[in-house]
Each structure stands twice: as structure tokens, then as C-alpha cells.
Amino acid sequence: MLKLLCLLLPLVAVSASPIDLGSQKDYLVLDLPGLSHLSETQRPTMHAGLLPLNLSFVADDDTEYFFWRFSKQDVDRADIVFWLNGGPGCSSMDGALMELGPFVINPKQEVEYNEGTWVEAADVVFVDQPGGTGFSSTTNYLTELTEVADGFVTFLARYFHLFPADVYKKFTLGGESYAGQYVPYILKAIMDDLKSDSGQLPKELYLKGALIGNGWIDPNEQSLSYLEFFIKKELIDIHGSYMPGLLQQQEKCQNLINHSSGEASESQISYSACEKILNDALRFTRDKKAPLDQQCINMYDYTLRDTYPSCGMSWPPYLPDVTAFLQKKSVLEALHLDSSASWSECSARVGSHLKNKISVPSVDILPDLLQEIPIILFNGDHDIICNCIGTERMIDKLEFNGDQGFTEGTEYIPWFYNEVNVGKVISERNLTYVRVYNSSHMVPFDNTPVSRGLLDIYFDNFEDVEYNNVSGIATPVYDVDKNITYIDSNDPRLQNGPKSSSTDDSAAHGNPFFYYVFELFVIVLLLCGLVYLYQYYSNSAPHSILADKHKKKSKNKSKNVRFLDDLESNLDLDNTDDKKDNSVMSKLLSSMGYQAQEPYKPLDKGANADLDIEMDSHGTSEK
């Protein structure tokens, strides 16, 4: 009787789906072009296909979300990561086939193994969302981030009905760029659902945390950082004839932000006048004498060039091969898609509908999330559109868990990968921030093995090291074929033996002892329930991923603005308190010989100015 109860437990935990989703075998991906060339250890177990949502808040809904799930063969991971790309309207197949998935696509449109795949550390599920993105389809395009979040919760309910064992894995939500809006909204919706007596999700779901890369979380801070970024990276001539126009646009953006009341009914995700700063900067810095494909700075990686006005829209360079791969009939069939299905990286229609006239920027809900779960924000330092300056200034001003920003005495810690300093990390009160060196808007695209180190930091899978008298942390280096982990090159190898799989589809793994192992698994599952309760209550308090010994105590807190600090010697700009940002801009204006019609000063946010403010979707895809 006990045996029967244990076997039925995963099914009881997930509420019945009103839709016939079939079985896991119906979604199994058995072959792909080039897969036979990979070693057995490099071939993941894969499931993919469309899940119908039947959204309750949409009449006659026909929305279907496409997912692609990867896990290591014969290995039962304790963690599962759901990954979302941004846009809005950009497919998560970017993440699956150009960033952190187990494959990259070669010029023959065949899969090759991705040496740094996150699938070595966790199961990973890539989801095209909202409807109309990538392979996902709909005739009912969503208009608010709250709707996007509710739609994803419905998708998860369908998914966990199909994969009930995944409910008991530690759930992490990850994404990049515009997913900086998606992820916080979805996290909030998941939390609300789990607390509701009528929620769609199983109560056993353990929400571990989130990772957001180059996130477009605070559009205002990002917009105000563009000009500073161009100046600091010497991408622009501060004495150029176009500078007064750029400064005027910066001032207009600042005034719009200052006049915003901050109330949900009047807030907007972004202002077109603020987005115009980046567009103008790219236009003014165009090199018309250069070859056509070198005339514009790549907004996703300032070290690269592109045609104008694309300015990075034709990047990454592997995109044509990915597109051709996903249009192959054999691939569509393997992914359980109709032969007439079409794929494009980004959908303008999704972005044009997602107006967010009611939804507030996700930075406003970030503090509440940080009370519940740890979140890692990471930024590649070559990105312009969602640059590290904007993210760091957002954190400086963010009030969370009893304080503003990271407190004085909380220091950046150097991060080493394979004895190379690849970034710096700071962590406190459930928030961790990582600046990743020599990386673009898509950090995993530039160096996937290093990006997996972000997951190791998130999993507390690192150790304290010292290289050349510099103390820091080091993340593992993985040897895939031998399934061995290195903490650093001087430490002995740590053997990670394969574990039995938790999936209920024996054909997926070809394990002849599967059913015996499964019986053992469900028994262990009951014990894990006790562990879950312990983790839930022990992790409820905000904490720092980094050890306390990296933090220096200080009685006094003093916050300085780093705005234009590289120019201080030339422009005679003093470090200024956060509350006086505008006075710093005023000094910059004066140093350029530019005088505004009115003094540039902070405006009363409560002032009822009659402003013609109109929000539109990003003119450039955030991928």
C-alpha cells in the first residue's frame, strides 16, 4: 500500500489539466542534424513541443507556448532553470542555440556541442513567450506585463502536469534583457499563485530564486546612463557639434522622469524621449567614411561595428545559421512542430501590442521579491543598451530589505575562472550583482563556460582563492567527457558520479534498472519533503551569497555618485551626493558651453505639469 502511495505521489501533487497534453513520450526529441556526431555524454535527453494554454482571461484563447527541455542522460539534477530571452517578442531559442543550451549551430546547420552549457549544472527549459514569440502562437496578443506573468503561470501549470517529477526540483527563473521586466513580474505571479487557495501551481513547488542578465529593469536609469557610457568609453567626442543636442535630449528625459508622479495609473515602462538618447548617440557617432558594415557602433557590444541603422540588429553572427536550422523540415518534425511552422528571432507584433499602459517598471516590485528569494543580476561590461552603469546606479538607489543599495563596507570580490579574473561580485541582503568583464549584451554567447560560473555562484558552488596576492572567489571548470569538476587548477579533481534519473520515461534514458531506481526515488522524495521544509524556513531570511568575511564594518554610511568620474580631472566635476545628480549634469552642461533656457535643477515630483508624455515600444529589440 505504501509503495503504491509513493508511486502515485508525483501525480497527486499536480492538479489535473483540463486539456489532454499526452505523455512525455509524445514530446521526446530523438534526433537532430549532427546529433550522431556527438559523444554519448554530450547528448542530452530532450523534450520539446507546444503546450496549449486556454488562458482564462482571454476569450476563445488559442495560445500555444513552445518549450524545449534539456537534461543530462542518466543524471537526476536537483535544480531546474527556466530561461527566457527578451525583446519583447524575441525567441528563447537564442538562449538555447547561441548561449547556454547544450548545442550551437555550425555553418552546415548541424548541432555541435556547447562546451559551457548550463545543462551540465541543471536541467534547463527554454520557453518562447508570450504568444507570437518564436514558435509560440496566438491570435490574442497580450498588452500588459501582468497578463504575460499570468500566462506563464498557466504554462507552468501545464508543464508540471506533463512533468510532475520536476515539481520537486528547485525552481529558478532566468533571463536577459527585456526579461528584466518578464522575470520579476512572473516571480510575483508565481508567489501570489502559491499563496492562493485557488492557485494553478502545485503547492510543493520550491521557488529557489532568479538570475537576470543585462536586464532592462529600470528603463529610466538605463536611458540616463547612455550618454555617460558613451563618454566613459570614449565613443563620442565631448567637444563635437552634436553635444548640445544630446545634452538637451538628456535634460528633456530627466525632466520627464522628475515630473512623473510614480503612481501606477500614470507610470509608464519607458519614455520615447529617453529612448531617443541612444538613437541620437548612435546617429551622431556614425562613421560615414568607413565601409558600410563598419559605420555604426554595435549597441550590444561597443567593441564591434555594424551597418547603419542596424547598429547591432544583425548580430550575433551565428543568427543566419540558427534561422536556417530551425526552418529545416527534419528539425520541425523532431521538435513536434507542423512542417508549415515558421521561426523568426524577434516579433515586432508582440512588442507593438505590449504597450504596458498600466504595468509599472519591474524595478518597483524588485524589493518585495528580495524579501522572499535571492536574485542575481549580472551585466556584461561591453553592452550599451542595458549597460552596467545603469544597472549599478539602479542598485545604488534601490531600497530593499531595510537599507538603500549595498551598504558601505560591502565590497566587490574578484571572480576567477580558470585562474583568470573574469569579473567582480558583490552580495548582500538577498541581492547579488556581478559585472562580467569583456562580455556583451548576451554574456553566455561571448563565453559560455564563464557564464556557467554565474550559475555556480548562484548555487554557492565556489571557493575562496588567492592568485598573485589577490583574494577572490573561483568557480569550477568542467570536463564534460570525464564528468569531472575542478575547483581550481591546483586542487584535486572531484568525481561527480552519475545519479539515477527522476523522469518517468524510461525510453528517454535507456536505463534497464529504471523502475527499481524509481521506487527508491519516491521513497527518497518523502525524505526530501522534510529537507524542503528545512530549506524553506532556513532560507527565508535575506542573506549574502558571499561569506561575511568579505564585508568590512562601517559605522557611517556615505553614498557617492560615480557619474562621469572618469572626466573629473578634465571637467572639474566633484563627487556629488546621489540626491544632487542634476547638479553634476549642470556642471557638464556648463563645461561644454551649453546653457539651458532654464537652470537644470531637480523638479518637484509632485508637480502637476501638463506634459505630453507618450510611451512606445522599444525601437530596437532587446533580444
From Swiss-Prot:
It is a single-pass type I membrane protein. GO terms for biological process: apoptotic process; proteolysis. Glycans are attached at residues 54, 258, 430, 438, 469, 483. Residues 17-512 are lumenal. One of its GO terms (molecular function) is serine-type carboxypeptidase activity. Residues 534-623 are cytoplasmic. It is an enzyme of class 3 (hydrolase). Its EC number is 3.4.16.6. It catalyses: Preferential release of a C-terminal arginine or lysine residue. It is found in: Golgi apparatus, trans-Golgi network membrane. GO terms for cellular component: membrane; trans-Golgi network. Keywords: Apoptosis, Carboxypeptidase, Glycoprotein, Golgi apparatus, Hydrolase, Membrane, Protease, Signal, Transmembrane, Transmembrane helix. The keyword Iron does not apply. It comes from the Eukaryota. The chain crosses the membrane at residues 513-533. Residues 1-16 form the signal peptide. Its main location: Golgi. InterPro entries: AB_hydrolase_fold, Peptidase_S10, Ser_caboxypep_ser_AS. Pfam families: Peptidase_S10. The active site is at 177, 383, 441. Belongs to the peptidase S10 family. PANTHER family: PHEROMONE-PROCESSING CARBOXYPEPTIDASE KEX1, SERINE PROTEASE FAMILY S10 SERINE CARBOXYPEPTIDASE. Protease with a carboxypeptidase B-like function involved in the C-terminal processing of the lysine and arginine residues from protein precursors. Promotes cell fusion and is involved in the programmed cell death. This is Pheromone-processing carboxypeptidase KEX1.
